[in-house]
Amino acid sequence: MITIIGNKIIIDSSRATLDDKASFEQAVNSILEGGATEIIVDLSKTVYLPSELLGYLMGKKRALMGKGMDIKISAISEPLKRVFDEARISGFLGL
């Protein structure tokens, strides 16, 4: 489940799904259409992201950075942070 508050997207599920990926994409597009240049993502409740959602997040971050925009992770659960560290993507994601 995804919650949007302003330019912040909260993934409310401990285990995100492919349905959450579709909702996340819609949320990102909605926030960008509203004129935001920065999107904040809260992963504090999430311990698992499907690879498709992670790939989308990384690809979208790269694309937005090329336009002077960004997606930033404001909070992350310890288990998910460990996965990002092991995959060596924490630096790219600004963690």
What is each residue range found by the language model?
Residues 95:
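Conserved catalytic-core motifs of GNAT/GCN5-like acyltransferases
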Residues 1-11, 23:
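Short beta-strand/loop segment at the start of cytosolic alpha/beta domains
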Residues 18-92:
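Amphipathic alpha-helical interaction surfaces in cytosolic regulatory modules
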